[in-house]
């Protein structure tokens, strides 16, 4: 259903507004470069600073432009269950292939609260739901046992795991079964993630180096870890440089060097420091994507 390299798409901005023409061009470029799916309006898509109307318009535009050529997993998370229900229903109505739903952040629900939250979403719309577990941002960590309870629901199909804990992949497979889709949420450890049984990555770096990230994923899924390791070595400096400051800011700067997108981000995020810009430019040259 979902596998391979799936960029967590940036949301282009121009003069403070969403730049839909550039978004359309980015989607076309991503598909032409070999990305296996698209994930709009996650954290990298600046979801916290988009209005509901902008959020839904971005999702609809990506689905429209993709036109069924690759799956679209729409960002639909919130720490307010009622709001998440709205986003999941919109994803379904807009024609998304799935919805990515982050664990509720800031209000710190219990494991039981998370089960109730995702159960409400599964009951609200008949659409495949991918759990997004990122305790570094949400301050809650969904356990494999909780995930197994949710995996029993027919529309809870997988997880984007950004714990950085490679042993978790095996633990989740043991708890949820081999059909439960596991996607990495951390570029730097995606090689090991797939070696443990993962099947893809929802990637920030793929915004900037989509062809290399797609080739990397294809190599790991074919069991060709020699090729994957060579690609990892090309990409690793870029993985690291993009995240010296907030990853979406780094990705937008890198895209600006490629002429694909402006650097514009919304407050409270700021543009990159000069030192980080140098690191990203050097990493792009190392990867062979910038002359």
UniProtKB/Swiss-Prot annotation:
Superkingdom of source: Bacteria
UniProt-annotated location(s): Cytoplasm
Active site: 132 (proton donor/acceptor), 160 (schiff-base intermediate with substrate)
Catalysed reactions, semicolon-separated: L-aspartate 4-semialdehyde + pyruvate = (2S,4S)-4-hydroxy-2,3,4,5-tetrahydrodipicolinate + H2O + H(+)
The UniProt record lists the keyword Amino-acid biosynthesis: yes
Its biological purpose: Catalyzes the condensation of (S)-aspartate-beta-semialdehyde [(S)-ASA] and pyruvate to 4-hydroxy-tetrahydrodipicolinate (HTPA).
HAMAP family for the chain: DapA (MF_00418)
Protein name: 4-hydroxy-tetrahydrodipicolinate synthase
Organism this protein belongs to: Dinoroseobacter shibae (strain DSM 16493 / NCIMB 14021 / DFL 12)
High-level lineage: Bacteria, Pseudomonadati, Pseudomonadota, Alphaproteobacteria, Rhodobacterales
């Amino acid at each position: 259903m979902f596998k391979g390299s799936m960029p967590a798409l940036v949301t282009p901005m121009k003069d403070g507004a969403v730049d839909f023409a550039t978004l359309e061009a980015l989607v076309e470029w991503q598909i032409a470069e070999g990305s296996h799916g698209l994930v709009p309006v996650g954290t990298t898509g600046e979801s916290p600073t988009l209005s509901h109307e902008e959020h839904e318009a971005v999702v609809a535009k990506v689905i429209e432009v993709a036109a069924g050529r690759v799956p679209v997993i729409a960002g639909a998370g919130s720490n307010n269950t009622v709001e998440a229900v709205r986003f999941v229903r919109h994803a379904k109505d807009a024609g998304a292939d799935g919805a990515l739903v982050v664990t509720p952040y800031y209000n710190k629900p219990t494991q039981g609260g998370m089960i109730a939250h995702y159960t409400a979403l599964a009951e609200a719309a008949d659409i495949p739901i991918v759990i997004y577990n990122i305790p570094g941002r949400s301050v809650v960590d969904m356990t494999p046992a909780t995930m197994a309870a949710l995996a029993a629901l027919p529309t809870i199909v997988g997880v984007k795991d950004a714990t950085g804990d490679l042993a978790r992949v095996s633990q989740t497979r043991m708890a949820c079964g081999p059909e439960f889709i596991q996607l990495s949420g951390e570029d730097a450890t995606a090689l090991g993630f797939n070696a443990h049984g993962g099947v893809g990555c929802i990637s920030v770096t793929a915004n900037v180096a989509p062809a290399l990230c797609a080739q990397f994923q294809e190599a790991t899924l074919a069991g060709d870890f020699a090729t994957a390791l060579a690609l990892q070595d090309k990409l690793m400096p870029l993985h690291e440089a993009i995240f010296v400051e907030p990853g979406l800011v780094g990705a937008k700067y890198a895209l600006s060097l490629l002429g694909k997108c402006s650097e514009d981000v919304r407050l409270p995020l700021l543009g990159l420091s000069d030192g980080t810009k140098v690191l990203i430019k050097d990493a792009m040259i190392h990867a062979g994507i910038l002359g």
